[in-house]
Amino acid sequence: MSDLQGRKVFKVFNQDFIVDERYNVTKELGQGAYGIVCAATNVHTGEGVAIKKVTNVFSKKILAKRALREIKLLQHFRGHRNITCLYDMDIPRPDNFNETYLYEELMECDLAAIIRSGQPLTDAHFQSFIYQILCGLKYIHSANVLHRDLKPGNLLVNADCELKICDFGLARGFSIDPEENAGYMTEYVATRWYRAPEIMLSFQSYTKAIDVWSVGCILAELLGGRPFFKGRDYVDQLNQILHYLGTPNEETLSRIGSPRAQEYVRNLPFMPKIPFQRLFPNANPDALDLLDRMLAFDPASRISVEEALEHPYLHIWHDASDEPTCPTTFDFHFEVVDDVQEMRKMIYDEVVRFRNLVRQQSQAQAAAAAQQQQQQIAQQTNVPIPDHQQGGWKQEEPKPQEVHAAGGHVNDLESSLQRGMDVQ
């Protein structure tokens, strides 16, 4: 193992998992199409981290682009309290490598597991979760970035209800110019249940409102204890949205970019909107008002993140001075790169640069800590470290999977809705 100097090998989900020698793997957390995740502990400090092994990075161009995007965005958003923190990265075998390791903040579970567990949640929990999602989203949007895959499974939570947004692999840039936005919906495969209707219906442009729709779906899921628009396929997804929200007005219908989808909606019988109070009779009226504004069918009528933060439902949490924006916008120019080998070099360079950065920071922090320790010794102080209880939810269920379309139900329309803005 001379080629793995300074590292150790563990078996995680029957795969070699190569970690920095400072860490011991303690628990398998999950596996999916993009890799495997485990919990690990720093043997010197006792600090826990989540280590994600991103596998088969260069087997497909789309996977390489997704990995590069995730790495860049996690660095750009590093430091916001409601976005998962990237601690370190590693490429143990850099020669023609096909996997990358990301060391991230360790959280206890995701919001999907909490909802599925049936653990009793109060209105105060709902307010806290939605507020934190919006704070993170405000920061993301201010960098001209759309997350595009907000769902309970991508919201990490601790026992103290601290929430952090993760998984930026599907994120895209946002421009005020609609022409620039129109081309960005290629390969858009976000979870169907949280996908805004304007994506399926191929509106001529898209906005930050697509993420607000997803937050509305999450709020409805919290209120009801289950996914709100749980379509079996894309046609059923659209039908469920129309069933609850009612038939769109003519101005909205005219902006549906897919002729097939527009014809389908126009040929449906008129449907009135079902009041959310009837669907969630025990909910806080302010929660239902916010939900109504988030789940506006027309994106132009949907509430913005900034407006949502000022909504009465969140007044107990809202503090404009403590809801920062990102100091710099994110540069998506790397998206034009199509050569896999060039992306391989870009990922390697990102990892090396970040590793050097965090190690320089760590050395500076260690020096400062040593100086502080010397001062404490000189003052003969002895402050005990508190013993925090490691409580919380223990669910180990897999994250919700997409429900595949059942059969050839309105095949042409289904294909049109699935591809969204690719259909022009």
UniProtKB/Swiss-Prot annotation:
Domain Protein kinase intervals: 23-314
Required cofactor(s): Mg(2+)
Record GO biological process: cell integrity MAPK cascade; cellular heat acclimation; cellular response to alkaline pH; cellular response to heat; fungal-type cell wall organization or biogenesis; hyphal growth; intracellular signal transduction; negative regulation of glucose mediated signaling pathway
Record-level GO cellular component terms: cytoplasm; nucleus
Modification after translation (UniProt): Phosphorylated by the upstreamm MAPKK mkk2. Phosphorylation is induced during asexual development. Phosphorylation is regulated by rlmA.
Conditions for induction: Expression is induced by cell wall-disturbing compounds.
Regulation of activity: Activated by threonine and tyrosine phosphorylation by the upstreamm MAPKK mkk2.
SMART domains in the record: S_TKc
EC numbers: 2.7.11.24
InterPro entries: Kinase-like_dom_sf, MAP_kinase, MAP_kinase_CS, Prot_kinase_dom, Protein_kinase_ATP_BS, Ser/Thr_kinase_AS
Disruption phenotype: Results in severe sensitivity against cell wall-disturbing compounds congo red or calcofluor white, and drastic alterations of the fungal morphology. Leads to reduced conidiation during asexual differentiation. Abolishes the production of fumiquinazoline C.
Region (Disordered): 375-424
One annotated GO molecular function: MAP kinase activity
PROSITE patterns: MAPK, PROTEIN_KINASE_ATP, PROTEIN_KINASE_DOM, PROTEIN_KINASE_ST
Catalytic activity: L-seryl-[protein] + ATP = O-phospho-L-seryl-[protein] + ADP + H(+); L-threonyl-[protein] + ATP = O-phospho-L-threonyl-[protein] + ADP + H(+)
Binding site for ATP: 29-37, 52
Entry keywords, A to Z: ATP-binding, Kinase, Magnesium, Nucleotide-binding, Phosphoprotein, Serine/threonine-protein kinase, Transferase
Pfam family, one: Pkinase
Function: Mitogen-activated protein kinase; part of cell wall integrity (CWI) signaling pathway composed of pkcA, the bck1-mkk2-mpka MAPK cascade and the downstream rlmA transcription regulator. The CWI signaling pathway regulates cell wall integrity and pyomelanin formation. CWI also controls oxidative stress response, gliotoxin production, iron adaptation and asexual development. Finally, CWI is constitutively required for A.fumigatus to cope with the temperature increase found in the mammalian lung environment, during infection.
Family classification: Belongs to the protein kinase superfamily. Ser/Thr protein kinase family.
Quaternary organization: Interacts with flbB, flbC, brlA, and rasB. Interacts with fmqA and fmqC. Interacts with hsp90.
UniProt protein name: Mitogen-activated protein kinase mpkA
Classification of source organism: Eukaryota, Fungi, Dikarya, Ascomycota, Pezizomycotina
Record gene name: mpkA
